[in-house]
Amino acid sequence: DIFYSFYKNDCITITGTNGKSTTCQILYEVLLKQKFDVRLVGNIGNPILSVKKVKKKTIFIVEASSYQLEYSKIFRSKYAAILNLTPDHIERHKTFNNYIKAKFKLLKNQLKGHLAFIKKNDLIIQREIKSSRIRSKITEVDKNKIDIFLKNIDNNYFLTETNKENLSFVLAISKKLNIQTNLLKKVI
């Protein structure tokens, strides 16, 4: 929230139980290749408030944990993704439902015209979407569609099911930013 009170720049915020760091790092590399002024911040290890030389066109890629989102009241991200949700940090949140609610603050704080990316066919995420007042446009991300994109890619690291899911989100967000898919392939 302190960050948001200083900067009103476009943010791409990634949360979920697994895959946040990988997804953020790939997105960051893709945007750098496309010559965007981009900063990678948040839970990934780069403190948000230590960022320097921020311009109007600077885009922030934010890795957000449930701990960071739990107390958020005003932070808004133009692009927001919830990769997946499985029981985690229950010692902090007390229940899985509280953990889900912390993660969903990211989408609930979005405005009309913002974009939310969620995993297709995820029953937990779908249930929460239906019971929440979400104003942003929702894009369902299907990892099964990434296989065509990954054809002829030799990097076995990205051929695991987990990384296919991560790349599916990167591809979906990249398309909304009008980034050429061949640049994404070069990064991979």
Give the label of every model feature segment.
Residues 16-17, 43:
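Active-site glycine-centered loops adjacent to acidic/histidine catalytic or metal-binding residues
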Residues 75-87, 158-188:
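A conserved, hydrophobic alpha-helical segment in the catalytic core
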Residues 11-12, 38, 59:
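Conserved hydrophobic helix-helix packing surfaces used for dimerization/oligomerization
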Residues 36-48:
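Short beta-strand-centered segment that lines the nucleotide-binding/catalytic pocket of NTP-utilizing
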Residues 3, 27, 31, 48-52, ...:
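Buried hydrophobic packing segments
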Residues 1-13, 24-27, 34:
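Short, basic phosphate-binding NTP loop
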Residues 55-140, 145-158:
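Flexible active-site lid/hinge loop adjacent to a nucleotide/diphosphate
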